[in-house]
Each structure stands twice: as structure tokens, then as C-alpha cells.
Amino acid sequence: MSNPDLSPQQIRAALAHLGSLLPPAPMAEMVIIGGAAGVLSGALPASRTTVDCDVLQVSPPEMFDLCRYHAEEVAQRFQIAPQWLDASAHTLAHLMLPGWRDRLVTIGTFGPLKVRAVGRIDLIALKVIAGRAEDLEDLDSLTITHAEAEQLLELFPAIQARGISPQTYAAALEVLSIMRPKNES
């Protein structure tokens, strides 16, 4: 492996090959989050790279197992990290904003695999909650509007009610207050 970082083109090619390895039926829907979702949806700059493709959900569930199984073959073929398809993101489902499924953006259909990314406001919310250095850089690139910050402040209590830790919730509100524009320009 020469470069652990994946460009949007590499991610798209890997997803296309993954789709070609799946059986023709049933159709599967994969929902991605994180940097891959941001660059493939156009919310983040195409120059941004990521080490993986974070999978929030695949339905039907049995297709999730097949995707993970075939991900190793994709990694070998494209000489990318074996963990390029990160299934651990499904543990973040409780952090999704109300209505997130209505805001999904279609990335492409690769054989029987339809790949969708979280919408912009949901991507921003997840980056605010994560609050890591790379997430803060992404938030700078996303240039949060005043209206988006207000929308997040209205929706965040629903996440708190679903079990986010008090420390994580407080940290997310702090990040949002720092990133929040003071007025619309």
C-alpha cells in the first residue's frame, strides 16, 4: 500500500467494485458518513482525502455482512487498507438528527448497491459531535451558516434524549458555539 489516504475517485472505484461482487438481488442500500460522505456528496472539497469509508447502515442487514466480506477483496485489488470499509460507524446511529433519512444524498448505484451519503446538516452535526482535529478542519471547509447553526441547536436536544453522554453533548455544544457565525453575511 503506497498511500493510506483515499481520494474521492478511489472511494468511488472501490464502491463500484464492491457492488460488482455482490449478488444481483436483493438490491442493497448503503448509507455512509464521515469524510467519504462529505467528498462524494460534494459537501467537502474534492482535494480532501480520508483513510476509510464509514458505513452507518446497509439494508437489508444480510447485505452488510456480504459487503464486509467482499471489502477485503476490494482492498487487495486496489491496494488500499484492509479496513477501508469501516463498519464500526453503525454504532453512531443514535447520534443522527431527527429526519436524517429524508436528507440522504444519492452518490451512485453500483450494480445492486445503492450508496447514499448523509445530508449536509447531518454531516455537520456528526463533525460537531466528533470534535476531533480533522473534524474541526472539515467544519471550517463546510462554512456553517447561521441558519444551520440555529437548526442544529434546535435538533441537538433530540440527540441528548437518545443517550449521548453528557460530556460529549457539552463538548458538541462548545464546538458549535465556536464554529457558529455571529451573523449572516
Region roles according to the model:
Residues M1-S185:
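Compositionally biased terminal segments of proteins
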